[in-house]
């Protein structure tokens, strides 16, 4: 064994061994308990960032630990390879998206191997290959035949710069999340999957997810948004159709003073023909912000359509307004407004001088004061005719029944969740497998024509999708009839909704999944990724699993038992102000800093002498130029050091502050372990440990070893507090480094302790542990070694701490044998000088003894 720790030599050698031995390749084995550990697959952007490294290190630690418990562990990896960034890069680099993507995959794969992640590379998938997306296309055609897929014209968020549709969540401050261009509203035909058909089950089954974070479950509950209410129909004077609204507060119905419709509603469109102000307003609404957060804060605007609706219970005429806060695609595109008891309706009514009618009493039974805001709390009705005096539930039922009796109302369960629009007007995605015949008939692509292959040898102009620009690509025949292919591609969330299942059988050619393999491995035991995916990917992931279950491919109801959302990685951020007032962000690597006595940054400059503004720690990002390249850190310190720091610096679900001083500390610790093993093994062979021959000090040290094993096992396995597990190992190492190594049993005990330490550290620092295990004479590769088991007998304390009181006041603490008698404890207490001075010259009148815990001497 060499004296110096040289990670660059060790790590490449160990990684080559894993590759040659195919150490982490697994197959189904009914004789072993399975464990499926999965980190969210990366987008091949070109280089790994520290967020990736944290995610995959957590996964690898869990997988290696479970493997050491003797389980059959699957830990696969792949590439979420379709998506818009590839198109931008292709235009910029004058290439096609495919070669750019495949080059990135090759580079990032090498980075993952350099970090020592124990993946089963035989299962690697790239979602942009026809071998993968052919099954997704086939499944889509089957969903279409089941009636779960449909096409309709829909108002969408349209980014004129990227020429694509954006989901509501991708609209930030009215602008595109990628390029910051102002988003427009546009009507285009789109394909949808009926996720709403599964809304109830998606909501209900959240209760089965005991090991998912409550925050994620709450976000999904709110996103699905189940509500119980009443759908009410209004007649409209001079308009051929009725208006239908949905309300969860029918108790306030007698206070409805106007209706509001979306700018795109047929009633508004008809009224605009003779109303220039309304026509201009409708035009303005085409660019309205549509993300819910934006709609909540934007200025509420509207125009009177001139139409009057008839209140079904009072017969009163109430105005119908077109308003920018009503959207056609939400509900019926019309809402009932009760300004006395809804703040949004109140603000709108106040602005335009509309009637505000209170119908709910304040909590103290008085009429509400509506001079400044609406009363939104539930309460007792007044001003409501026959319903006066009813509280919320009774009023809800009475008014719902009355409306039903008159044929103008119906109880209904509604959801905020909308069907999943899967069409994207981009090139680099899986083609949607649908065709249109010359007579307009729409059909799924026949199975013998699947996959519909995306041509990869294309020229990108940055404006039009190559498959839209090439009329020949769209031409095909179906059943001998000419047809045109769909030129939209799938939303990339389609690929990431089922990849976890394909990992169980990536080479299977008979269908989307080999049910036998899928049902052996699924559900995933732990899924690791960022909380930013809570309501998009993680909802579609659950939805797709249920679709595959109903297609007979899997038997479980949910795709993953546990979800672990890792925290973000933060780093220092610095900038200087340029000549034109712009901020120029400087990498923390290039910042020369001065710190105060507490280590806080007080001054900073860069190599060019610019005075830098320090903005504190923020998420590593390209925009702030504060990302730290993992490659540089691995080359400087080794992969094991980077991994250890990542797991030690913070609890896995909390933010991690990148500090190079912490990385240096992790490196020093590994060197200390190396040094102790080197010194120990240099002394030659070790005798067998004889537990019965150990001295009290040796027993105490062995007790510490086994208590550490118990704690680390609990911290990694049950609590998943990886940082405290590492802290416990570090604490034990301090004791081992100070322990005597002269006697035969000293060395035998150290041998047992070091073999335990190396195995406990193995999930975190696998390269150095692989090497040290061999040096310590461990049997076989450490990758196949069992996790150390705490010896219950060794952990039994043979002494205990007894608190000594005199007249009820604590005067000292004494260590006694566990089996000491009361007499022995009293004698030992009398020898303790802190206690003895209170007993001098007094008589002990009474003794209260709680064995092994407390001795109270009552004196007088």
From Swiss-Prot:
Q: Can you cite an annotated GO cellular component? A: cytosol
> Does the keyword ATP-binding feature in the UniProt annotation?
yes
Q: Where in the cell is it found?
A: Cytoplasm
UniProtKB keywords: Aminoacyl-tRNA synthetase, ATP-binding, Cytoplasm, Ligase, Nucleotide-binding, Protein biosynthesis
Q: Name one Pfam family in it.
A: tRNA-synt_1_2
State any GO BP term from the record: leucyl-tRNA aminoacylation
Enzyme Commission code: 6.1.1.4
Residues where ATP binds: 622
**Which HAMAP family does its entry note?**
Leu_tRNA_synth_B
Family per record: Belongs to the class-I aminoacyl-tRNA synthetase family.
Q: What is the protein named? A: Leucine--tRNA ligase
**Species of the source:** Salmonella paratyphi B (strain ATCC BAA-1250 / SPB7)
């Amino acid at each position: 064994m060499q004296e110096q720790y040289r990670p660059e030599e060790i790590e490449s050698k160990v990684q080559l061994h894993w590759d040659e031995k195919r150490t982490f390749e697994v197959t189904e084995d009914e004789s072993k308990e399975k464990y499926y550990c999965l980190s969210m697959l990366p987008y091949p952007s070109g280089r790994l960032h520290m967020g990736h490294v944290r995610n995959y290190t957590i996964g690898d630690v869990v997988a290696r630990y479970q493997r050491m418990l003797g389980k059959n562990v699957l830990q696969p990896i792949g590439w979420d390879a379709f998506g818009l960034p590839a198109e931008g890069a292709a235009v910029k680099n004058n290439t096609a998206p495919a070669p750019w993507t495949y080059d990135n995959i090759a580079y990032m794969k090498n980075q993952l191997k350099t970090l020592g992640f124990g993946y089963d590379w035989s299962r690697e998938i790239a979602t942009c290959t026809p071998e993968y997306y052919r099954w997704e296309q086939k499944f889509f055609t089957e969903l279409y035949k089941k009636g779960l897929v449909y096409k309709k014209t829909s108002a969408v968020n349209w980014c004129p710069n990227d020429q694509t549709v954006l989901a509501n969540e991708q609209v930030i401050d009215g602008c595109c999340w990628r390029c910051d261009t102002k988003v427009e509203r546009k009507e285009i035909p789109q394909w949808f999957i009926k996720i709403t058909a599964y809304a109830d089950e998606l909501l209900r089954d959240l209760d089965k997810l005991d090991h998912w974070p409550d925050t994620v479950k709450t976000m999904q509950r709110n996103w699905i948004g189940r509500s119980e209410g009443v759908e009410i129909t209004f007649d409209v004077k001079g308009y051929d159709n009725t208006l239908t609204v949905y309300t969860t507060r029918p108790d306030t119905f007698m206070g409805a003073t106007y209706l509001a419709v979306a700018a795109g509603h047929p009633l508004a469109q008809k009224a605009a023909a003779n109303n220039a102000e309304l026509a201009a307003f409708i035009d303005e609404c085409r660019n309205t912000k549509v993300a819910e957060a934006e709609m909540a804060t934007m200025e509420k605007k509207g125009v009177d359509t001139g139409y009057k609706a008839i209140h079904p219970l009072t017969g009163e005429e109430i105005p119908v307004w077109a308003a920018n806060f009503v959207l056609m695609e939400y509900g019926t595109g019309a809402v009932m407004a009760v300004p006395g008891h809804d703040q949004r309706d109140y603000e709108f009514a106040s602005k335009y001088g509309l009637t505000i009618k209170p119908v709910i009493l304040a909590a103290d039974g008085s009429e509400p004061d509506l001079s400044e805001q609406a009363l939104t709390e539930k309460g007792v009705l007044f001003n409501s005719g026959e319903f006066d005096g009813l509280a919320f539930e009774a009023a809800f039922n009475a008014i719902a029944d009355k409306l039903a009796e008159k044929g103008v109302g119906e109880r209904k369960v509604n959801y905020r969740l909308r069907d999943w629009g899967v069409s994207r007007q981009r090139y680099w995605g899986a083609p949607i497998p649908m065709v249109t015949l010359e007579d307009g008939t729409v059909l799924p692509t026949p199975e013998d024509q699947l996959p519909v292959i995306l041509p990869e040898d294309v020229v990108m102009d940055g404006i039009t999708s190559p498959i839209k620009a090439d009329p020949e690509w769209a031409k095909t025949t179906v059943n001998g009839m000419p047809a045109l292919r769909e030129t939209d591609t799938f939303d990339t969330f389609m690929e990431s909704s089922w990849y976890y299942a394909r990992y169980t059988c990536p080479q299977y050619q008979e269908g989307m999944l080999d049910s036998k393999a899928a049902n052996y491995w699924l559900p995933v035991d732990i899924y690791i990724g960022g909380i930013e995916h809570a309501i998009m990917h993680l909802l579609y992931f659950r939805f797709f699993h249920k679709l595959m279950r109903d297609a007979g491919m899997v038997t479980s109801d949910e795709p993953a038992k546990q979800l672990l959302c890792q925290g973000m990685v933060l780093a220092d951020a610095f900038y200087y102000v340029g000549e034109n007032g712009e901020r120029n962000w400087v990498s923390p690597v290039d910042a020369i800093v001065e710190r105060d006595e507490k280590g806080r940054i007080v001054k900073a400059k860069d190599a060019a002498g610019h005075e830098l503004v320090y903005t504190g720690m923020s998420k590593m990002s390209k925009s702030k130029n504060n990302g730290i390249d993992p490659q540089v850190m691995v080359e400087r310190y080794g992969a094991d050091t980077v991994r250890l720091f990542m797991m030690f610096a913070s609890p896995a679900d909390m933010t991690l502050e990148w500090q190079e001083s912490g990385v240096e500390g992790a490196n020093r610790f590994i060197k200390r372990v190396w040094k102790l093993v080197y010194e120990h093994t240099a002394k030659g062979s070790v005798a067998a440990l004889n537990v019965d021959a150990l001295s009290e000090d040796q027993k105490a040290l062995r007790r510490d070893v086994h208590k550490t094993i118990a704690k680390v096992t609990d911290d990694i396995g049950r609590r998943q507090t990886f940082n405290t597990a590492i802290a416990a190992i570090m604490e034990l190492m301090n004791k081992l480094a100070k322990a005597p190594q002269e006697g035969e049993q000293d060395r035998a005990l150290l041998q047992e302790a070091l073999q335990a330490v190396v195995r406990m550290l193995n999930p975190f620092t696998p390269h150095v542990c692989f090497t040290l295990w061999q040096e310590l004479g461990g049997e076989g590769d450490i990758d196949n070694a069992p996790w150390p088991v705490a010896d219950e007998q060794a952990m039994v304390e043979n002494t205990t701490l007894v608190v000594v009181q005199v007249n009820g006041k604590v005067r000292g603490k004494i260590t006694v044998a566990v089996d000491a008698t009361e007499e022995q404890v009293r004698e030992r207490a009398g020898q303790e000088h802190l206690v003895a001075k209170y007993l001098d010259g007094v008589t002990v009148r009474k003794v209260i003894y709680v064995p092994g815990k407390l001795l109270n001497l009552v004196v007088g």
